Amino acid sequence: MADQQLDYASAKFVTSAPDISKLPPDSGIEVAFAGRSNAGKSSALNTLTRQKALARTSKTPGRTQLINVFELTTGQRLIDLPGYGFAKVPLAVKEKWQRSLSEYLQQRDSLKGIVVLMDIRHPFRETDQELIYWAVDCDLPVLALLTKADKLKQGARKSTVLKAKQAAIAFNGDVQVEAFSSLKRIGVEQVEEKLNQWYSKEYDDE
């Protein structure tokens, strides 16, 4: 069956959950967005959904430790995972978040793909690599977005993306790399295309 063409502008906030046990019932399809606290995750979600304030952009990276749930249509959700890797977050909070993330990736049947956002100037930091390896171990496809792509000139951007694609081979999984810019709307079409594939999986699996 052809991939669904979803209207991402229809996304609506549903709930904020402190951990996986407080999420909506594990049915339908979820796609999760994850990234370091300053990777531009909230801006990417707002750009994708064409809503300026769907996901709150915090001036204090690492402040939000809740899982935010947005619904596109019945049973189709976007999951905004808490930012990770920020130095000012207490160690106990980091450890709790790591446990929660691990549980979510391993146990959530409705999770069909994860978007990992990384600053194009600092891709594949240790925490990013850990997350991608976890996802691959759970047989989850990954879309790695190199955010803030407008910060690099076109030649440098292409070179960085090419190097990142080569580096992604080492994960030995379904890891696609794309440049992304919320400001210039670079890569939005590629994100929509990949998400449409993932949201069509329920039909392919039946």
Curated annotation (Swiss-Prot):
Q: Name one GO molecular function term.
A: GTP binding
An example of a Gene Ontology cellular component annotation for this protein is: cytosol
Its biological purpose: Necessary for normal cell division and for the maintenance of normal septation.
UniProt binding sites for GTP = 35-42, 62-66, 80-83, 147-150, 180-182
Cofactor(s) it depends on = Mg(2+)
Which superkingdom is the protein from? Bacteria
InterPro entries in UniProt: G_ENGB_dom, GTP-bd, GTP-bd_ribosome_bio_YsxC, P-loop_NTPase
UniProt KW keywords? Cell cycle, Cell division, GTP-binding, Magnesium, Metal-binding, Nucleotide-binding, Septation
- Pfam families reported in the protein's UniProt record: MMR_HSR1
Tell me what this protein is called: Probable GTP-binding protein EngB
Entry similarity comment: Belongs to the TRAFAC class TrmE-Era-EngA-EngB-Septin-like GTPase superfamily. EngB GTPase family.
Repeat in keyword set: no
Q: Which organism is it from?
A: Idiomarina loihiensis (strain ATCC BAA-735 / DSM 15497 / L2-TR)
Q: Where is the EngB-type G domain?
A: 27-201
Q: Where does Mg(2+) bind?
A: S42, T64
Its BP terms in the Gene Ontology are: division septum assembly
